[in-house]
């Protein structure tokens, strides 16, 4: 068990001799930096290891940019207008952060290869009020898409009108595969930005929240030397150091990237039947009817369902009446407003496969009822 990886009789010193019970070590113990770097596909010198939540790091990055600016640029809070690009459907908690700071959010359509890069380039390269973009590049939330090599390279080669434009690269599902033989891979955005002469343009985030424990994992940020130095100026005021015992616990338990991957195979064995239960019902009951579309992801934590336009809220409401609680329709869009009222995020992780199949049966029944009502109303 992970909780037994360290105990009262353990040597509680990091590999460099740091006593993990003490204060200090702002950016994480060396072995934890190595573990997170390997997980994220980068190198330890790009890493700061924080506490348990990558969302906390993302919030801090936006907050810091808002109050103190990035690398000497004007703090966003002093500007008349700040905009963020939001690939949709996307992660509601990303959108909640930017909405909290009063940042204007712009929808960017997604495809199986990633965001519409023509739109991204048009906005980023020509509008200096565009300061960032939210990205879940691998097994995206909620669609399960992985950005293509071309998409990653186009991101790295952006020519932002704003010097302080940043890509918020939330690599939440970087090792969260569902299958051993069908796994998506993605280019390392850090090295691609370096090759393109844009080393400072990206903040990458990841955590072990869906690897070890949701509230007790470790989280990390990867970025350039200049960005890390800038962040540490504030971080040294904010904290004396994060939970090094938890960092040590994770390294002692997983040991290395191979240990992480082997552990995630066990997760996949639990998750895969749940996803397949939903997909089987969707394919059997809705396949070929033209009243919904979905994608079979190879990893991540969600299935994205697109109903007929104008039907999502009613489908979710009918499901709730019948005892199946879904994520609110519209949650996958900024401000909770899906322009087409069609996207529904399905999260299969919690119920058993049998419960999931039963819930999926009810879901497709509601889809059919609402769709028929919609068609008859025309």
Regions found by a protein language model. Name each.
Residues 50, 191-272, 372:
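Conserved core segment of the aminotransferase class I/II
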Residues 132, 166, 203:
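Hydrophobic "anchor" residues on beta-strands that sit immediately upstream
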Residues 315-321, 359-364:
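Short amphipathic alpha-helices in soluble, non-transmembrane regions
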